[in-house]
């Protein structure tokens, strides 16, 4: 039986009770994607992007939860941790449900990154490969079977997704820093 008070389930309940059919995973992916693309952490800009995905202006309770989610993401991306926590169903949810949420998270991330990335031609080969991986992962949600191998594959992909955003964030953060002035050789 799924744990009803998981962060994912709590957010899903909040969204559903407010009339939003968007997955918490897709919303979290959107937030991380836009943050990793260099959109910054302006709450109003995040709420505008979220409202577009939600297809309506969020009510105060959803709005407050979205701001809290952004604060969590900000502390993860700017802190000392080397992974982020993904807003996904608990491990006791069926694998098909978790895999679908993983795909939705990737789709949200790619949307957020794509809408906010200033110049993708400046990304390293490694960063470009991460984005390609995310696109591929977003398509494989039906390929995982309820089995030990399927579970192992899911966990491997999830662990990858916990570190991949940090690479993209550090890369776009570097692009925002102007090059240091070269000392003159007089």
From Swiss-Prot:
Pfam family, one: UPF0149
Signal sequence segment: none
GO cellular component, one term: cytosol
InterPro entries xrefs: YgfB-like, YgfB-like_sf
Domain of life: Bacteria
Entry's family note: Belongs to the UPF0149 family.
Protein name listed in UniProt: UPF0149 protein Pfl01_5435
Taxonomic source organism: Pseudomonas fluorescens (strain Pf0-1)
Lineage: Bacteria, Pseudomonadati, Pseudomonadota, Gammaproteobacteria, Pseudomonadales
């Amino acid at each position: 039986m799924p744990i009803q008070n998981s962060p994912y389930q709590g957010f899903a309940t909040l969204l559903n009770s407010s009339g939003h059919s968007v997955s918490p995973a897709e919303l979290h992916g959107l937030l991380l994607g836009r943050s990793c693309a260099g959109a910054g952490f302006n709450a109003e800009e995040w709420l505008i992007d979220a409202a577009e995905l939600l297809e309506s202006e969020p009510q105060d309770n959803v709005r407050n939860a979205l701001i809290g989610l952004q604060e969590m993401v900000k502390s993860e991306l700017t802190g000392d941790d080397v992974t982020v926590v993904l807003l996904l169903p608990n491990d006791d949810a069926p694998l098909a449900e978790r895999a679908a949420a993983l795909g939705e998270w990737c789709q949200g991330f790619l949307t957020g990154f794509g809408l906010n990335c200033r110049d993708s031609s400046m990304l390293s080969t490694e960063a470009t490969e991460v984005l390609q991986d995310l696109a591929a992962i977003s398509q494989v949600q039906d390929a995982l079977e309820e089995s030990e191998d399927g579970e192992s594959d899911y966990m491997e992909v999830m662990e990858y997704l916990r570190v991949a955003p940090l690479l993209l964030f550090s890369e776009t953060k570097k692009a925002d820093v102007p090059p240091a002035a070269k000392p003159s050789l007089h």
